[in-house]
Design a protein with these regions (language model features):
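N-proximal low-complexity "stem/linker" segments adjacent to membrane-targeting elements
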Residues: 1-30, 256-293
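Hydrophobic/aromatic residues located in beta-strands of well-ordered beta-sheets
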Residues: 13, 38-40, 165
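Acidic helix N-cap motif at the loop->helix transition within catalytic regions
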Residues: 22-25, 47-56, 96-97
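A conserved acidic beta->alpha catalytic loop
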Residues: 30, 42-51, 88
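Short, structured coil segments at secondary-structure junctions
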Residues: 34, 55-57, 137, 161
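Conserved donor nucleotide-binding strand/loop of the catalytic core
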Residues: 36, 50-78
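Conserved sequence signature across two-component system core domains
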Residues: 41-43, 87, 288, 293
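Catalytic-site signature of metal-activated, phosphate-bearing donor transferases
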Residues: 69-77, 82-87, 94-259, 264-271
Length: 293
């Protein structure tokens, strides 16, 4: 399957996992023979992920999840090769991309510290071309000693490079979402992480935020980024991402209110609460808001 059955590259392929028994075998099979090191960093899977990784010849390291950026930075420290390719378990390297990676690393000058790779997102059984889902480039092929992930960005992580970045033409195949329920559930998780990040950054929502941000996102996804090209699916994705914006800012508002109460001891009195009657003890804190919303 690999072009010319070439020798493995001085490359570490790293996959972060949590309960990925369904996707991981296909991911690892797609990079067989590509890299000298295949590393799976697992954060506590209770399915067959670890067993399947080892059966495929991958090294497995266990590390408690402390955030995506933190997890990737820790994985970079474990890379034994000068180049690193980060993959998600539901991504696949095509033979064309395999050949291009080999050529790119063979020709990379000292000034190049990374490569952007386009992503072909497959959702609900089809390739999504509009709405910002294509080419959806990510900085995934990195020089191990010259790349770090910004710790303050937890969703859609940002890489800081000591050097220049070039681009590859052939895409990763991303088997992104197979059902609408799966898509909405993951966006809800991302909203919670983003809300926490907004609070840490000191960004408070204003009244116009709750209407303005979702409206802008809907227009951006469906019109500016031509989500209409994907028909009803494109409309669903645009509306869902607009809802994601609203959900994120509503969660941020709840976090800010909880933080303000915890720091000042001030209690919000519900409308109509009887005068002279003491409010019960509050039990709401940041962790409860995140879990229970």
């Amino acid at each position: 399957r690999r072009a010319c059955m070439s020798e493995p590259l001085p490359l570490s392929v790293i996959v972060l996992t949590l309960n990925e028994e369904r996707h991981l075998p296909g991911c690892l099979a797609s990079v067989a023979g590509l890299a000298r090191q295949i590393l799976v960093v697992d954060s506590g899977s209770h399915d067959r992920t670890v067993e399947l990784a080892r059966a495929a010849g991958a090294e497995v390291v266990h590390r408690a999840f402390t955030g995506f950026a933190s997890q990737r930075n820790a994985a970079l420290e474990l890379a034994r090769q000068p180049w690193v390719l980060f993959l998600d378990a539901d991504e696949r390297v095509t033979p064309e991309l395999d050949a291009e990676i080999r050529q790119a690393l063979g020709q990379a000058t000292d000034g190049i510290a990374g490569f952007w790779i386009p992503t072909q997102n497959w959702m609900f059984g089809r390739w999504i071309r509009g709405g910002g889902w294509w080419p959806d480039e990510h900085l995934r092929l990195l020089r191990a000693g010259r790349a770090r992930y910004r710790p303050d960005v937890e969703v859609h992580e940002v890489v800081e490079l000591a050097g220049e970045a070039s681009r590859l033409a052939h895409p990763l195949v991303h088997i992104n979402y197979e059902s609408y329920r799966e898509f909405l559930a993951k966006q809800a998780r991302y909203a919670r992480i983003r809300a926490e990040t907004l609070v840490r950054q000191g960004r408070r929502p204003r009244r116009h935020t709750y209407l303005g941000q979702p409206a802008r996102e809907l227009w951006r996804r469906f019109v500016t980024l031509r989500g209409y090209r994907d028909g009803p699916v494109g409309l669903f994705l645009a509306v869902a991402m607009a809802w994601h914006e609203l959900h994120t800012w509503l969660l941020a508002r709840r976090l800010w209110r909880a933080a303000d109460r915890n720091s000042t001891g001030r209690r919000d009195v519900p409308a109509g609460w009887p005068a002279g009657v003491e409010l019960p003890e509050a039990s709401l804190d940041l962790s409860v808001v995140i879990v229970s919303y």
